[in-house]
Design a protein with these regions (language model features):
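N-terminal glycine-rich anion-binding loop in soluble enzyme alpha/beta folds
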Residues: 1-60
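Short, well-ordered coil/turn segments that N-cap beta-strands
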Residues: 12-16, 63-66, 96-98, 134-137, ...
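Conserved, mostly hydrophobic/aromatic
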Residues: 18, 68, 103, 139, ...
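Active-site-proximal loop/turn and secondary-structure-junction residues that shape catalytic pockets
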Residues: 22-24, 72-76, 106-108, 143-145, ...
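Acidic (Asp/Glu)-rich catalytic clusters
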Residues: 58-65, 90-95, 154-159, 227-230
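N-terminal active-site wall of soluble small-molecule enzyme domains
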Residues: 64-66, 70-132, 222
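Conserved anion-binding
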Residues: 104, 108-212
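A C-terminal functional module that forms or caps the active site or interfaces directly
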Residues: 217-249
């Protein structure tokens, strides 16, 4: 899947990803009114408004961009209807040949991590058949629990030819409370970056690994260091724009 992402970027000449992080009060009033007229001011109505809003964004941009990144929490807050809207969004984006990176930030161990990985990137066994759950192409992963939390995702990625983006240095202001702490004279984010590079060596595409990294645009100097540590790692760079990251950096 990393090869498809790179191919899409080259085809569109746009190394960007469109975030589909809908907030109900930001959705245009006419979309909300139509959804509420059909489903009422209910979770189902909110989910319909979100789905229609997302569809409009995708229809307006799909031929200009390589990928989208829906943030699952924005859908989960609306319960099962919200998750249904998330799934519809994923499926619709894939029908437009967009690469879909599920911003799920999962982090657990053992069978729980494996279940997350299967649910978002793989196929679950049901009797004699297998079914895809959410079926994203990539997923974001929190490495705080170590290899026990990441390896199950890697196993599914290897089987499905999909990928992950591991949180290394995030864009939020308080990220340094843990990520910048030094261990034997080196910041934690550098050590995580080294581990991501090692994991990536096990899952290589054409030049880049299926194991990517999340490195915030709000910390460009740290990003330069991490690029040297992770030369074969595709980097997802949040924080551009509203959070203060600039293209020149």
């Amino acid at each position: 899947m990393i090869n498809k992402l790179i191919s899409n970027i080259r085809r569109t000449n746009a190394p960007i990803v469109v975030g589909l992080d809908p907030m109900l009060n930001y959705i245009p009033e006419h979309i909300q009114k139509k959804a509420f007229a059909e489903f009422g001011e209910t979770l189902e109505g909110a989910a319909e408004a979100i789905w229609q809003y997302n569809k409009g964004i995708v229809d307006a941009t799909y031929d200009l961009i390589p990928a989208v990144k829906p943030q699952i929490a924005m859908y989960e807050q609306f319960g099962i209807p919200g998750l249904a809207a998330y799934k519809k969004t994923v499926d619709y984006c894939k029908s437009k040949d967009l690469v879909v990176s599920g911003d799920i930030k999962r982090g657990d161990i053992g069978s729980t991590s494996a279940a997350y990985a299967v649910g978002h990137l793989g196929h679950v066994q049901v009797g004699s058949k297998k079914y895809a759950g959410f079926d994203e192409d990539f997923a974001t992963v929190n490495p705080y629990l170590g290899s026990d939390g990441v390896k199950p995702f890697m196993d599914v990625c290897k089987e499905e030819k999909k990928g992950i983006f591991v949180l290394v240095k995030t864009s939020n202001p308080s990220s340094g409370e843990f990520q910048d702490r030094e261990i034997d004279g080196r910041p934690l984010y550098e050590l995580v970056g080294e581990k991501v590079a090692q994991w990536g060596d096990e899952l290589m595409g054409d030049g880049y690994s299926y194991v990517g990294a999340v490195v915030g645009a709000t910390y460009p100097e740290m990003g330069k260091v991490l690029r040297k540590i992770m030369p074969k790692t595709f980097i997802l760079v949040p924080g551009y724009g509203a959070q203060g990251g600039k293209g020149a950096e």
